[in-house]
Amino acid sequence: QNIAGADRRMSYAAVPSAIFTSPEVASVGLNERQAKEEGFDVRVGKFPFTASGKALAMGEAEGFLKIIADGSTDRILGIHIVGPHATELIPEPTMAVRMKMTVAEFARTIHAHPTLAEAIGEAAEAVHRMAIHV
């Protein structure tokens, strides 16, 4: 886009990674260690796929979803997924990191039931100790 005359800036903090293993792995943003090294007041919300009705019904309940947030601003710093269809679930977390969403904003996103994506909302609620399935 820049070569065509547009003035665009790339946010490398919001570039997802995907590993096509079994289970799949997907990640965007900072991990816990990186967030601590950068001086953030790190808060973590974690949701296991063993608590996901959809993952259990699929017979693919191995793994978890983890959200890393800044405790002082509630901003989402990173989201990491190990589990079924992680590479398909990472776009929504990528948007949250790119848009600098807060955990509270992200947790208010409605996820259809039963879906694997519900784990995203549950992990956000877990940051504030509000998850209902764990």
Where are these regions (language model features)?
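Flexible, glycine-rich terminal cap/loop adjacent to redox cofactors
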Residues: 3-4, 15, 20-134
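Glycine-rich active-site loop/strand segments that organize a redox cofactor
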Residues: 6-11
